[in-house]
Amino acid sequence: MSSNTGDQFANLGKALSTTASVLFSSQPMEDTILSYSSPYKKLLHETITNAGGGSSLVKVRHDVKLSKGKNTGFQDIYSNSKEFFKNSYSDPKTTFKVLSYLSDDLLEDAPRDTIPQNKNMITENGEKRSAKSKKQEPTLFQGFEASLPVINETIELQQKLIMNSDMKPLTDSESIPVYAEEEEQEEEFSLPDHLKADKLLHSYSASFLKDASRSITDNLDLLEIQKNLAASEIRELDIKLEKLKMMRELVFKRVAKIEQHELFLEKHLNNVKDRIDMIIEYNMDKEYSSEDEENINGLSELSPKTGETNETYETAATTPLENKEEEHSPLLSKSIYQQLQDHEKKSDISERKKHSTSKKIKDVGVSHRNRRRKTYPTLQQFYDSGSKITSLPKAHDEDITCLDFDMPFGTMCSAGSLDHSVKVWDLSKKKQIATLHGHLASISCMQIDQYSTLITGGRDAVLKLWDIDKAMADEASNSSEDNDACLYTFDSHVDEITAISFDGDNLVSGSQDRTVRQWDLNSGKCTQTIDISFATGPMRSQRNIPLRNSVLLTKEPPAIGALQCFDAALATGTKDGIVRLWDLRSGKVVRMLEGHTDAITSLQFDSVNLVTGAMDRSIRIWDLRTGILSDVFAYEQPITSLHFDLDKIVISNNEPTVKIYNRKDGNHWFCGEDDPEQGNVDFVRYKHGYLVEGRSNGDINTWAI
């Protein structure tokens, strides 16, 4: 054994004897062992760090094989934390104390708090501390002690919820959650350490009162810590909510982008279906080949844009091939356009011109059967109820007379009181995409379906059937023909058309000539005329109601203010305030609903209820099964329009706000700001939680309801 090892064992023996004397002495162990001049510390230091580097701890490190190229510390040579303190000459506890000991020299560099620590967070007298003193943070133990009551309360509440989870609610009050009942009950507080308020007020013992004061002060300290902990949780929740809000915005934009993609694919899917119908109808089907693809690619610059296929087809059908070289051109020899021309050569062109109008009308019915949408927009349901989605300021120069849209974020058509045309809008892109010209006077009513079919009626006593897709294609290609999108014109009425409704192949229109006409959309012919006979006279309630900024001041209410048809059922609302239910198969009235005291301006029905609005300011809800009035309510101004679904009824009455009535719970609320400078709402349309309203200043707004 070397001399270094012998000295090491000798020093270790001295250290062990010193340790035994410390353990059996009456002086505190920490003061003896960890003092700067401790003989125990000195002997152990000499034992472990013996001169010459012969200590066991140093040998262990040199004996371990370290991997090359890695920067490892002393702790990295052991697989777990316990092996870090193992050696051949001392137990792990002793080694831990030695290795974790910090001398006074090292502690001199540690930052010190010049302000003495005050255990009390507030003074006993409840006075605020001096502004110069720094705020003392609670210790870890104080925070743990303050959180214990909250933890216990949470555990008790959880136990109550578990105990009540198996109990079936027998009454409405028993079905209320336990935590809700706890919140409704008044909170009772008590003094700490079972102190009684009466005893404190009547006690003359100074020591008892001092102890009580300290106890209450300590309790206030704990409450202050609890409050700070709760405030910290609120701040953390606010941060999390902000992050969740940002994430929601990102996902919201993703949904909007996906729905835009769906609309794009739906549009091209409809074009493909129309193409298939045309090929099948004219028996032009053939096998697809690579040469067809080359010819189509070669014609891509010459072929019309999307939506112009029908126009190209009609032009090819009526234009003969005069150039022989063009007829044998390799570019067109095997293209589908050449087949179209060859097919039309064999057909009777004059006969096609004769029946071209009836074919357009027939295509509307075919379109309805084939164009079934696979997807529908749902983005509106992710907006807050009553929030504005978009705005189209000054969409028209004057007030909006009528508007309609096919689906949320889809296509909208609108008309103004001084316009003789219809404007077509893309609600998702918030811009005008087409204009429909053809009426000779202002347009008073319109309806659009989800298949891009629009029917309008105006003061020129005509109805027009429009193809919106064709209008958008013509607008995109800068077509010079204004009436290409008009498929048909119905012109049997002799006065202004005030109301229309179409369902499937049937179209019903009401006019100031006091007739209701039924049209066949397959042939364009009027199949039935119903005369509406009622006595005329001054409207009683209207004369006593002051209107503000209303177009109703300048004209009398229409003879037929509203109507709706479904299959063989027809409902009409007229100037005499009576709702008539008709059977279109017989052309006779089957029921009359009386109750309004003025002209009816709007109505709508579903399978159960009929809702009517009139100039007597009232909304009436009728039960169609019994003909009895189910509900009635009124507003301050006459009703101009209404629309509803299974959940809500939206109403306009020449006021700045849209009135909303919840059909399920009966609640009334307003949508928009009550600001007269923004104009009054004249017309509303509502579908699938998506509201579009037109105002007297020409603005159009969309809302999430």
Curated annotation (Swiss-Prot):
Ranges occupied by WD repeats: 395-435, 438-476, 492-529, 547-594, 595-632, 634-671, 676-705
Gene Ontology CC annotation, any one: mitochondrial outer membrane
Subcellular location: Mitochondrion outer membrane
Comp. bias regions, Basic and acidic residues: 125-136, 342-351
Region named Disordered: 110-136, 290-310, 342-369
Coiled coil is among the record's keywords: yes
SMART domains for the chain: WD40
Protein keywords: Coiled coil, Membrane, Mitochondrion, Mitochondrion outer membrane, Repeat, WD repeat
Membrane disposition: Peripheral membrane protein
UniProt xrefs under CDD domains: Mdv1_N (cd22881), WD40 (cd00200)
Gene3D superfamilies hit by this protein: 6.10.280.220, YVTN repeat-like/Quinoprotein amine dehydrogenase (2.130.10.10)
Positions in coiled-coil regions: 216-250
Family: Belongs to the WD repeat MDV1/CAF4 family.
Function of the molecule: Involved in mitochondrial fission. Acts as an adapter protein required to form mitochondrial fission complexes. Formation of these complexes is required to promote constriction and fission of the mitochondrial compartment at a late step in mitochondrial division.
PANTHER family cross-referenced by the UniProt entry: F-BOX AND WD REPEAT DOMAIN CONTAINING 7, WD40 REPEAT PROTEIN
This protein's name: Mitochondrial division protein 1
